């Protein structure tokens, strides 16, 4: 019942959408996400191995990805590495885009309307920068879930800024495993 309610509230996935799986099923989070996919009627794409997650994401083109913070940290580090090896102009455009995205995310995370000029700037940022990050993750990612350990605030802010929200959950094996989580429109980063 709790998993059903939480998935409905979050709009986790719809029938026919693709969820991406690499979490071990011996762990309650991975197993619960598998059961949730069966219940919701999603298609599960599996990573070939942990070292090929990014390549597998591009091939599978998932809508949903549950993961532990370490995976999001690795993706963030790869994006930062690409930024650092870019030209000065590209770094300026990247930094401007992330700043715009963070401002937009503040409105979205509290369920407030985004001002028109900020929405326009965000569409430009998406076209110039964010679309490339989305493409590396398959281009259809709607929701990412993090659990198993605390997710660094800087990393979560970045993903929200680029339009790839990560919803943090907390739970225990005994709570199957999600006890509480952030929901779209009511996100408090770092909680």
Region locations from a protein language model:
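Conserved structural elements of the adenylate-forming
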Residues: 1-12, 131
């Amino acid at each position: 019942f709790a998993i059903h309610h939480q998935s409905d509230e979050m709009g986790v996935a719809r029938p026919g959408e693709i969820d991406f799986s690499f979490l071990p099923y011996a762990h309650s989070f991975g197993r619960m996400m598998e059961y949730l996919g069966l219940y919701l009627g999603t298609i599960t794409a599996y990573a070939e191995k942990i070292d090929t997650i990014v390549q597998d994401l591009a091939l599978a083109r998932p809508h949903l990805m549950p993961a532990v913070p370490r995976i999001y940290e690795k993706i963030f580090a790869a994006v930062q590495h690409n930024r650092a090896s870019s030209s000065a102009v590209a770094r300026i455009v990247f930094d401007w885009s992330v700043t715009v995205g963070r401002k937009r995310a503040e409105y979205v995370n509290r369920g407030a309307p985004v001002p028109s000029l900020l929405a326009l700037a965000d569409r430009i940022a998406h076209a110039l920068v964010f679309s490339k990050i989305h493409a590396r993750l398959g281009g259809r990612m709607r929701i990412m879930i993090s659990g198993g350990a605390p997710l660094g605030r800087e990393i979560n802010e970045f993903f929200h800024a680029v339009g790839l929200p990560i919803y943090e959950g907390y739970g225990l094996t005994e709570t199957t495993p999600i006890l509480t989580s952030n929901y779209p429109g009511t996100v408090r980063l770092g909680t």
